[in-house]
Structures are given as C-alpha cells and as structure tokens.
C-alpha cells in the first residue's frame, strides 16, 4: 500500500471510530473541505505532515497515535 492510501484509510477509520464526519472534522481542525475531500477521495498525492498534525488536533490524538495502525506497517517505497 502506498503512503497516501494509508493516510486516506486512517482518516476515514478514525472518523468512523469517533462517529464523526469528514465535514465535521474540517471544522474541528481548520482544514478546508476541499483539501480534506481531496485527501479522503485519493485525489491528493502529497499530504503534508503539517496537515496530518492539524487532523490530529481535530481528532484529539497524537501524531504517533495517528500512525499507530496496520495501514502503515508494509508501505510501498
């Protein structure tokens, strides 16, 4: 799996686990809906660490907790 796909799946998983929507997450973390939609739809090919950090703030988790998922275990280089 590529990194961008792992990030996309992790965001969707965290939203589902917290019973929130991607739209609500935009409000919580201050990311534009178009940016988050591009990430979660797979159109964005280069999500920055700064964006992931903002998502973590909105999700109330640490950056290491975001990456603590089997999605990131066997990434393609």
Residue ranges and their predicted role:
Residues 15, 26, 56:
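The alpha-helix within a helix-turn-helix
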Residues 31-46:
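Recognition helix of helix-turn-helix/homeodomain-like DNA-binding domains
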